[in-house]
Amino acid sequence: MLSSRFLVLGAQFSVLSALDYHHTPVLLTETLAGLQPHPGGWYIDGTVGGGGHAAAILEATAPDGRLLGIDCDPAALAAAAARLAPYGERVTLVRGSFREIGRLAHKAGFVQVQGVLLDLGVSSYQLDTPERGFSFQASAPLDMRLDPDAPMTAANLVNDLPERDLADLIFRYSEERGSRRIARAIVEARQRRPITTTDELAEIVSRALGGRRGRIHPATRTFQALRIAVNDELTSLDAALPQIVELLVVGGRMAIITFHSLEDRIVKQFMRAEAQAGHLRLITRKPVEASSEEQRINPRSRSAKLRVAERA
């Protein structure tokens, strides 16, 4: 039986749907070493996902530590509710975006906390569920929304943006050098009929770039760019970071896990600027990366980078 806090703040998500949710938390040991959760501490996981990191934090903060978990994906919250149910009233789950982490935390009673975690990666469940449209490994609707109730999909961008704007978007959010060729190919294809599936878009991009050359699929960067744009990910990160600093007590820590250079650059520059201003102390001078063993077990951890800073 779920606690009342799940029912009140977790809103309308089904615990039964969590049975199919799978996601291996990356850099788990390193994240705990960075956050240093302790008994009785209050922590926020701004991207709670399936609850892997959150469960480890709750174990470390027993018997009376508290955790607020935030996620915009109802499937993720369902998984977190099921996984974290044994911790009862120590857990509060809220549906929302981490870009509003300050408001959501205050509303839930988490005004000053000992630590905040953001894991910015797309979960294995989201990647491996075809209808979510994040992957080109299967034919699926061109969606890519982390929040399934958000108004804009990748199909909207691909079919509606002017060619120049589409090229700029792809380059800005993926640094894809062939962005103009890709945009031209997309516009030519959509003039014949709307582009509606992931495999269709992947084939268009692959042809525009001359086919596959190496381990990485030619459409990988374009899919990344569209996902970032659909979910406004970089703007959300920019908005969240200063709010996190305000939530931390002196000595409290923020741990941010990124998965591409654009995110990591934002986090690195923010932490360095705040350290120079005397608001933060850098715990990781260089990003922490997954061990070779973790990369072998979980290949999706290869691009993960962890940065940690402490409130001064």
UniProtKB/Swiss-Prot annotation:
One of its GO terms (biological process) is rRNA base methylation. It holds the Pfam family Methyltransf_5. Keywords: Cytoplasm, Methyltransferase, rRNA processing, S-adenosyl-L-methionine, Transferase. Residues 289-312 are annotated as: Disordered. It is found in: Cytoplasm. Its EC number is 2.1.1.199. Transmembrane segments: none annotated. It comes from the Bacteria. Belongs to the methyltransferase superfamily. RsmH family. HAMAP family: 16SrRNA_methyltr_H (MF_01007). This is Ribosomal RNA small subunit methyltransferase H. It comes from Roseiflexus castenholzii (strain DSM 13941 / HLO8). The gene is rsmH.
